[in-house]
Amino acid sequence: MRVAVTGTPGTGKTTATEAVETALDVIHLNERIREEGLDAGRDEERDSLVADLDAVEAALAGEDDALIESHLAHHVDADRVVVLRCRPDILQERLVDRGEPAAKAAENAEAEALDVVLSEAVAEHGRESVYEIDTTEASPSAVAEAIEAVIDGERAPAVGTVDFTEHL
């Protein structure tokens, strides 16, 4: 089984997946993209690599028992997609605290308020495969437990349970 853990940068994907207890191989997709050159160049304005999603899919071929973590994870084939969410003002604060430029943090906070990643995940995988989890007040261990429940089939798909539109 392939499980994708995705969300806007700053929602807690890396921290949570590092705490997940699972037999699945944990793949930090952004690291793989950098290490294996699975990019199509650099976005100078955002100072980030642009992933070559076809190359990413090819690199992941045969890795069927995996927990794939990245803000891009919802773009790869997966049986279940966990979308981590965080209140936009808290998300923006987290990003600034970790050294992201204020403009980039604000852009990500707006994307979170607009449900960008959630909408993309539902469009690519369908509502029946998407599990929305609010990380705003949750500890990393609680988020990890929620992800484990998705992996184990103990949590029902949920879309639209988190609403941050008042932050627009």
Swiss-Prot record:
GO MF annotations, alphabetized: adenylate kinase activity; ATP binding; ATP hydrolysis activity
Enzyme's top EC category: transferase
Keyword terms, alphabetized: ATP-binding, Kinase, Nucleotide-binding, Ribosome biogenesis, rRNA processing, Transferase
InterPro entries linked to this entry: Adenyl_kinase_AK6 (IPR020618), P-loop_NTPase (IPR027417)
Region span, NMP: 28-51
Residue ranges, annotated region (LID): 97-107
Residues that, per the record, bind ATP: 10, 12-15, 98
Catalysed reactions listed for this entry: AMP + ATP = 2 ADP; ATP + H2O = ADP + phosphate + H(+)
EC number: 2.7.4.3
GO BP: ribosomal small subunit biogenesis; rRNA processing
Primary role: Broad-specificity nucleoside monophosphate (NMP) kinase that catalyzes the reversible transfer of the terminal phosphate group between nucleoside triphosphates and monophosphates. Also has ATPase activity. Involved in the late maturation steps of the 30S ribosomal particles, specifically 16S rRNA maturation. While NMP activity is not required for ribosome maturation, ATPase activity is. Associates transiently with small ribosomal subunit protein uS11. ATP hydrolysis breaks the interaction with uS11.
PANTHER family per record: ADENYLATE KINASE ISOENZYME 6, POS9-ACTIVATING FACTOR FAP7-RELATED
Family: Belongs to the adenylate kinase family. AK6 subfamily.
Assembly: Interacts with uS11. Not a structural component of 40S pre-ribosomes, but transiently interacts with them by binding to uS11.
Name of this protein: Putative adenylate kinase
Species annotation: Natronomonas pharaonis (strain ATCC 35678 / DSM 2160 / CIP 103997 / JCM 8858 / NBRC 14720 / NCIMB 2260 / Gabara) (Halobacterium pharaonis)
